[in-house]
Curated annotation (Swiss-Prot):
Positions where Phosphoserine occurs in the chain: 47, 50, 212, 235, 272, 294, 346, 349, 372, 649, 816, 1038, 1128, 1303
Biased composition (Low complexity): 526-541
Annotated spans, Disordered: 1-41, 260-556, 647-768, 892-923, 967-991, 1070-1094, 1113-1133, 1145-1168, 1192-1221, 1262-1310
Recorded coiled-coil stretches: none
GO terms classed as biological process: actin crosslink formation; actin cytoskeleton organization; actin filament network formation; actin filament polymerization; collateral sprouting in absence of injury; digestive tract development; embryonic axis specification; floor plate development
Keyword Nucleotide-binding: no
Motif extent (KKRRAP 2): 356-361
Composition bias, Pro residues: 361-374, 411-423, 1276-1291
Protein name stated in the entry: Protein cordon-bleu
All residue ranges annotated as the WH2 domain in the record: 1185-1205, 1225-1245, 1313-1333
Species of the source: Mus musculus (Mouse)
Subcellular location(s) per record: Cell membrane; Cytoplasm, Cytoskeleton; Cell projection, Ruffle; Cytoplasm
Annotated Gene Ontology cellular component terms: axon; axonal growth cone; cell cortex; cytoskeleton; dendrite; dendritic growth cone; membrane; neuronal cell body
Pfam families recorded: Cobl, WH2
Gene of this entry: Cobl
Length: 1337
């Protein structure tokens, strides 16, 4: 406490410091200061004390003073001596009605007759006052400062002089230029006599000195010194000299040199802007010797003298960048001046020089002595120009390894379309525009391209082929081409042991090129150096070595043509050998599994050598491809094992037409959008493969069947892969033979692509894997896609032979690749894909594989799961799961709105661990092992774009045992969800919904189950894609139109058919929305798939679907006996009960829903009619009573129905106390209503009650339109009518009756009355509430 007080007491430090400022030097001063400091303190004390004393002394004293008013009037007054002067002023002003603020006091002493100075608080008694003058204040006239002088306006004038120099001067824009000229000259250090002001140094327009800057409208001018710059026009317009001057920093040295040279040559300075002699001497320069006197370019060229060798000429013509290129002089420059080579070189184009620069470093041993490199360079340049493979115009540091590697690839660079193994002639003619001299080169290309297939343009059969002219220009940009071209040869060299070192160098160079290629999005499909090339076979490597040697010969063309035939034969042998080798290799297992893809890939010569898991640049396109994602992913996984060489060789066998077709396939596959999001998942998985597949895509798409087989093969576990070897090889043979056919078959789509293929197919650029190790760096739209962890890994990592390969779960869903060699193409869906989208194919493949395994071992599991229907349905995959869930809700468009809400309920339920249906839907692997597989899928779906497949496969599957306990809960969940959404969807279903609701409450368990609320009479059009609300266990619900893709996904295994049958059975019960739990599960899963399958049933599944009675006719479709799989007794009871319910009140359920449905064109699967989604909230349990009452009122014939419904609902929930009071008409009416006794009981009770009921009936009839909307709106109880003044209870009904009776004409009144009654009933308050709210309108 003390510290704060001390601080508070302390004066501010700033003031203290000022008060104690150091005193002036000298002790006396210090003493004076101290005394002064002390005196004021004492004085103040004394004054204060004296004041007190004076006040006391003067308090009783009075003074007689003379007051002189402002008007001059004098007035005598007596004033107390204790008054202060200010007080005196105020008093005097008050007495004389004056304003104190406008007056002042002036005191005259009686002795001195002089005015006295005083303070406002000075006591009058202390002063010797005799006269007081009261004067008006004179306002002091303040001298207003004069207007500030506005600053003179000025602008910044930019003065250019001596061509390159600038100066900025601030001058007035209003002043004539002649007044500004001295300032400009002073700034520029020039003589005003020799300066002429020009508008600019180009036009040379002279400015009038009499005009100002504003008049001329300029802020920049050129001050031309007519003495320094003799040649104004020529020099001012000489941009080159300006650049030269700017570039040269050593002005003085450059000037001296140029001057001396100019003088020596006898130049009068025509090129120089200033007199060389003066510039040299510096005279008349005014210190501004900043510009070179003569253009260095001309002087240099002249000084070169007679030696106008190519190098010198290039030095003159080439730019600085060219100079840099020439920096590392190749060994040949000396020879150029001496030999004929020099003459040829002088004629060679700058492109040749550039290439020289690149090749300047001594070529690897394979190249010829220094003189030869020049000529080969030219040839290479020509080839490169035609093929744009070497990147003619590229200005890049020399890459010696590339140079060596380039030689062979240059010849090959223009890859012709796939060359039939023996048909070199055919391939040769295939040249691209701009390959003027390329007939030979084209021949060479086929040869080289065969071995180069994996990395070379040739591999794509013209992927990078572009008109030679364009290629030359593009070569620099598309260094990818050159890099790629070298890379193919490099890849081959990798195969060859002799070229192993060279291949390493090329490897690095290719990678560098790959980085360059990334910019251009190298079109080359073939991955440049997949290790698989090593496997490709010594033959291919030998070919490459031969090729490497071939370019060295001057007769390259002939030599190459000769080799072409040889290489073709060798390739054929190599292909056979390699195929065998592939099969033998463990990696070949996957390759053989991919055999189909390999052969198909043959079409695309691009073996998966690029399998570097390089996601192909065309990510967007990938999704479009109908190829099996499984195939792609398997490729990616097996890419390393893939023997791209074999593929390349195989592809070489393919006829060019086949390859062409295959190429279109690749394109079309990418182009064709996958309707189903799952396909996107496939894309994700496949994209890495697509990089490979892009090369291989041609075969991939060749045949949907082939693709399906391939995908299956790829997907299958090692066992499947082993099978795949045989099957793949056989299938690959089929594909080889049938590639043309397949490609043709696919070509209807691809036809478009074929046309584009003639030009370097754009997809080829995308598909081409660029630099060997830079798989991810690709121009175009390359997205670095981390290959999704293959789902197969999730299946069984132990079983997988290849790390990335898709694996088969224990159930073997993906096990047998050849089980379903032919893919059933779903009926043409809205989607462009003629073939089922890759997702559908993959899923189909999975299903079939799983079907095989199901037929064998997994059949047992399927049987166990049969009760849970959903499990068998699950083989469809996560996509199915989502789709099935969606289908459950979507079975009918009408139900979609409800199903959405319902879907929300389902999602909530699913979130609970008991999600039997959703889990079962996800049963693709119907084992806990599958669950592990599925979980990674779930991650994949979240991690990768549009992983619909992952979603469908993701959710863990519920085992049969788990499903059974959940069956009842599932039913309840389904029913609850149905109730929640069905009331808005169908008024008639309200009661059944209640019942289901009650059932759910009885079971008291919520299960995440997908319910297929199928409105009776709602039929899905055969062609229509039911909108599927996908409620994934993830909690996501996506309503999507699932075309063939979804249907493909929804194809069921044999086990599933039984589940579907169950679903249909539940539907046949007529209680579509309330199906037994197992049925509901099956129905949800199977119905979803059914709806999908119905829309596009796979050929195999159509019969199955029919057998399973998937066709739902107004919910009355009967499924064959086999359709009903084991139902738990509870299920059967529920089903029968539901059937009874629906039959008991068929009219109420079906009248509205069926009528609405019948009006619309309907197919077997239901009406196409769509309803706007209605936001539905779970309604109170009494909603069903209300709906039942309304139905009874409308139909007046459903009393029995209503009674039964009430009984049903009463089972589920405790009956409400019936307030039956015989003495009260009102109570009787309420009792009748509660008991659903109908009008008869009311009539029996009393006439008043009957009248009221009749009035309700009339009101309902009078405003039927109102009733329905209200019924629909029951989800939110209408506000009760405002209670009128209370009336006797018995009279209320009658009053309401009369009012309603009269108000039939005015529906609003009847609506209010009816709403009030409805509210009472709905709220469950019963008679008590009605008593409280008498309906007196």
């Amino acid at each position: 406490m003390d510290a704060p007080r001390a601080l508070a007491a302390k004066p501010p430090t700033g003031r203290k410091m000022k008060a104690r400022a150091p005193p002036p030097p000298g002790k006396p001063a210090a003493q004076n200061v101290h005394s002064e400091q002390k005196l004021p303190h004492d004085a103040t004390l004394g004054s204060q004390q004296s004041l007190v004393y004076m006040k006391e002394a003067l308090q009783n004293s009075t003074l007689d003073i003379t007051v002189v008013l402002p008007s001059g009037l004098e007035k005598q007054s007596v004033v107390s001596g204790s008054h202060a002067m200010m007080d005196l002023l105020v008093e005097l002003c008050l007495q004389n009605h004056l304003n104190p603020s406008h007056h002042v006091l002036e005191i005259w002493s009686s002795e001195t007759q002089q005015p006295l100075s005083f303070k406002p608080n000075t006591l009058i008694g202390s002063l010797n006052v005799h006269t007081v003058l009261l004067k008006e204040k004179v306002p002091e006239e303040r001298v207003k400062p004069g207007l500030t002088k506005a600053p003179e306006k000025s602008v910044r004038l930019v003065v250019n002089y001596l061509r390159t120099q600038k100066a900025v001067v601030r001058v007035s824009p209003e002043v004539p230029l002649q007044n500004i000229l001295p300032v400009i000259c002073a700034k520029c250090e020039v003589n005003p006599e020799h300066v002429i002001l020009l508008r600019d140094n180009v036009a040379g327009e002279e400015l009038e000195l009499s005009k100002s800057l504003n008049e001329l409208g300029i802020k920049e001018l050129y001050a031309w010194d007519n003495r320094r710059e003799m040649f104004r026009k020529s020099s001012l317009g000489n941009d080159e000299t300006d650049k030269e001057k700017k570039k040269f920093l050593g002005f003085f040295k450059a000037n001296k040199r140029s001057n001396s040279k100019a003088e020596h040559l006898g130049l009068s300075g025509a090129d120089s802007d200033e007199d060389p002699a003066k510039s040299a001497s510096g005279g008349d320069l005014n210190g501004c010797v900043t510009t070179p006197n003569s253009p260095s370019l001309h002087s240099r060229s002249l000084t070169l003298g007679p030696s106008l060798s190519l190098g010198n000429i290039s030095g003159v013509s080439m730019k600085s960048d060219m100079k840099k290129r020439r920096a590392p002089p190749p060994p040949s420059p000396k020879l150029l001046g001496q030999d004929k080579v020099s003459e040829k070189a002088s004629l060679s184009s700058q492109a040749d020089l550039q290439k020289k620069k690149r090749r300047a470093p001594a070529p690897p041993p394979p190249q010829q002595p220094p003189p030869s490199p020049v000529v080969p360079n030219r040839k290479e340049d020509k080839e490169e120009n035609r093929k744009s493979t070497v990147g003619v115009g590229r200005q890049v540091p020399q890459k010696p390894p590339r140079g060596t590697a380039r030689g062979p690839p240059q010849l090959v660079l223009p890859p012709p379309p796939p060359y039939p193994p023996p048909d070199t002639d055919v391939t040769e003619p295939v040249t691209f525009p701009g390959e003027g001299a390329g007939s030979e080169t084209s021949e060479l290309r086929p040869k080289l391209s065969l071995p180069l297939g994996p990395g070379s343009h040739c591999s794509m059969g013209g992927v990078s082929q572009v008109p030679a002219e364009s290629e030359e220009t593009a070569s620099e940009d598309t260094t990818e081409d050159s890099g790629v071209m070298s890379s193919p040869s490099d890849a081959i060299s990798l195969d060859s042991q002799q070229d192993s070192m060279r291949s390493k160098d090329k490897w690095s160079t290719d990678q560098e090129d790959g980085s360059d290629q990334d910019l251009a999005g190298t079109p080359e499909l073939g991955p440049q150096k997949s290790p698989s090339w090593g496997k490709s076979g010594s033959g291919s490597s030998i070919l490459r070595t031969e090729k490497a040697t071939m370019p060295t010969n001057d007769d390259e063309d002939l030599f190459i043509t000769g080799h072409l035939h040889q290489t073709l034969a060798e390739l054929d042998e190599d292909l056979e050998g390699m195929e065998e080798n592939y099969e033998t290799d463990t990696s070949s297992l996957t390759n053989s599994v991919n055999g189909v893809s390999n052969h198909s890939l043959q079409e695309a010569i691009i073996p998966d050598s690029g399998v570097d898991d390089i996601p192909v640049t065309f990510i967007g396109e990938v999704s479009d491809e109908p190829f099996d994602s499984g195939l792609f992913s398997s490729r990616c996984n097996n890419a390393t094992t893939f023997n791209t060489g074999s593929i390349a060789s195989q592809r070489s066998h393919l006829s060019p037409s086949q390859t062409e077709h295959s190429q279109p396939f690749v394109r079309t596959s990418r182009k064709e959008p996958d309707p189903s999001p799952p396909s996107q998942d496939n894309r994700k998985r496949n994209q890495p493969t697509l990089a490979n597949t892009s090369e291989n895509e041609n075969p991939v798409e060749t045949d949907p069947t082939v693709t399906s087989l391939v995908s299956k093969l790829l997907i299958d576990d090692p066992k499947a892969k082993d099978k795949g070897k045989v099957h793949g090889s056989s299938h690959s043979e089929k594909t080889q033979a049938g590639h043309g056919i397949n490609s043709l078959r696919v070509n209807p789509r691809d036809g478009k692509d074929e046309s584009s293929n003639s030009a370097p197919p754009p997809w080829s650029h995308h598909g081409q894997a660029l630099g060997g190790s830079y798989g991810l760096k690709y121009g175009l739209t390359t997205y670095k896609i981390v290959p999704p962890k293959s789902e197969m890994r999730c299946y069984d990592r132990d079983v997988s032979l290849s790390t990335g390969a898709i694996k088969i779960d224990e159930l073997g869903n993906l096990v047998s690749p050849h089980m379903n060699g032919s893919r059933t193409i779903s009926p043409p869906s809205a989607v462009v894909e003629t073939d089922t989208p890759p997702i559908g194919k993959v899923k189909e493949f999975w299903r079939r594989n799983s079907m095989e395994k199901y037929l064998n071992g997994p059949a047992e599991c399927t049987i166990k799961r049969a009760p849970s229907t959903t499990i068998t349905a699950t083989p469809e995959k996560p996509q199915q799961d989502n789709g099935m869930k969606a289908a459950f809700t979507v079975t009918t468009p009408q139900q979609q709105p409800a199903s959405q809400e319902y879907g929300a309920h389902l999602e909530e339920e699913r979130s609970r661990p008991q999600s039997a249906v959703s889990c079962s839907v996800k049963v693709p692997a119907s084992n806990p092992t599958d669950i592990t597989f599925l979980k990674p899928q779930r991650r994949t779906s979240s991690q990768y774009v549009a992983s619909a497949i992952a979603k469908k496969m993701g959710p863990p599957k519920v085992h049969a045992d788990v499903v059974r306990p959940h069956k009842a809960t599932t039913e309840q969940c389904h029913e609850e969800a149905k109730l929640a959404r069905s009331p808005p969807t169908r008024k008639d279903d309200a009661a059944p919904n209640l019942h289901s609701e009650a059932r759910q409450h009885e079971h008291g368990t919520n299960q995440s189950s997908v319910c297929l609320p199928s409105n009776p009479g709602v039929q899905l059009p055969a062609g229509g894609h039911p909108k599927v609300e996908v409620n994934s266990t993830y909690g996501k619900s996506s309503t999507q139109d699932y075309p063939a893709a979804v249907h493909r996904n929804s194809y069921f295994l044999p086990g599933r058919s039984s589940h579907r049958d169950r679903v249909s059975v539940g539907q046949s019960c007529g209680f579509n929305e309330k199906q037994t739990t197992s049925n509901q599960k099956a129905n949800s899963t199977s119905n979803f798939s059914q709806a999908l399958d119905k829309a596009h049933p796979p050929p195999l599944l159509l019969a199955e679907a029919r057998d399973s009675g998937r066709i739902l006719m107004n919910g009355s479709a009967r499924t064959p006996g086999n359709c009903e799989p084991p139902h738990s007794p509870k299920e059967s009871t529920l089903t029968s009960y539901i059937i009874l319910q629906t039959e008991e009140k068929p009219s109420s359920l079906s009248t509205d829903g069926q009528d609405a449905d019948d009006t619309l064109p309907s197919s077997i699967f239901g009406p196409k009619k769509k309803f706007k989604p209605v936001i539905q909230r779970p309604l109170p349990k009494d909603v069903s009573l209300h709906s039942a009452l309304m139905e009874a009122i409308h139909s007046s014939g459903g009393r029995e129905k209503l009674r039964k419904t009430a009984e049903q609902t009463s089972e589920g929930r405790p009956k409400k106390p019936s307030y039956v009071e015989a003495e009260s008409e009102r109570s009787a009416l309420l009792a009748a209503i509660r008991g659903h006794s109908g009008t008869l009981s009311l009539r029996k009770v009393s006439s008043l009650a009957s009248e009221e009921l009749q009035s309700f009936r009339n009101a309902a009839l009078g405003a039927p339109g109102l009733d329905k909307p209200q019924q629909e709106d029951l989800g939110l109880p209408p506000p009760p009518a405002l209670p009128p003044p209370p009336a006797p209870a018995p009279q209320a009904p009658s009053a309401s009756v009369t009012v309603s009776r009269f108000s039939t004409g005015t529906p609003s009144n009847s609506v209010n009355a009816r709403q009030a009654l409805m509210d009472a009933i709905r709220s469950g308050t019963g008679a008590a509430r009605l008593r409280k709210v008498p309906l007196l309108v």
